[in-house]
Regions:
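Short, flexible coil/linker segments at or flanking structured domains
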Residues: 2, 27, 86, 131, ...
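Core catalytic region of metal-dependent phosphoesterases/phosphodiesterases
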Residues: 6-7, 11-124
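Acidic, His/Gly-enriched loop-helix segments that form or flank divalent-metal centers
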Residues: 100-173
């Protein structure tokens, strides 16, 4: 029976490797039960802590490859639970840390395709479409990682609506 609605799922700000594994397990169970037709991973799947400009805990010794491996395993699990879903990955501000790190520390490597997020996280193999500019319009709704933050409840949504002229779904805030 054909329905006149679409099952869409939004998941923002997992921040691997600092993810909450219990919350992620609940999310996986929900994906399996809900069977969404479209999934938006709304940025900041990676934290990129190892390459951030912030002071690092020397006892942590977290490696960037560990962050990537954790994020790929999350994506693989999502894909395994729903092989038919269209999956979009919206760029977040933490993914932008990769490019900034290269610009500041290894300009000569900044143009390598192998170091682009879609290759580091194996989007092609997993059938994930990358939204590089961090925002897309999907069936009349803006979907983005977002950066607008306001002090009072509801003001962020109002500011986003005024900026974009339509309803939307934002992460980050």
């Amino acid at each position: 029976m054909k329905t006149n609605y679409e099952k869409v799922l939004f998941i923002p700000d997992i921040h691997c490797p600092f993810q909450d594994d219990k919350a992620l397990e609940v999310f996986y169970q929900f994906v399996q039960w809900f069977k969404p037709e479209t999934i938006f991973i709304m940025g900041d799947l990676l934290d990129c802590y190892a390459i951030s400009r912030f002071t690092k805990d020397p006892n942590g010794a977290l490696k960037f490859q560990e962050e990537l491996d954790t994020a790929v395993s999350v994506l693989e699990r999502i894909r395994h639970l729903n092989k038919k879903a269209k999956i979009y990955y919206i760029r977040g501000n933490h993914e932008a840390r990769i490019q900034k790190f290269l610009w500041n520390n290894a300009k000569e490597l900044s143009g390598l395709h192998a170091l682009e997020i879609e290759n580091l996280l194996d989007f092609k193999r997993l059938g994930i479409e990358y939204v590089k500019d961090g925002m897309m319009k999907y069936k009349g709704i803006i979907v983005k990682h977002g950066s607008v933050v306001r002090k009072y409840a509801g003001y962020t949504a109002k500011a986003e609506f005024e900026k974009n002229g339509c309803s939307g779904v934002s992460a980050h805030t």
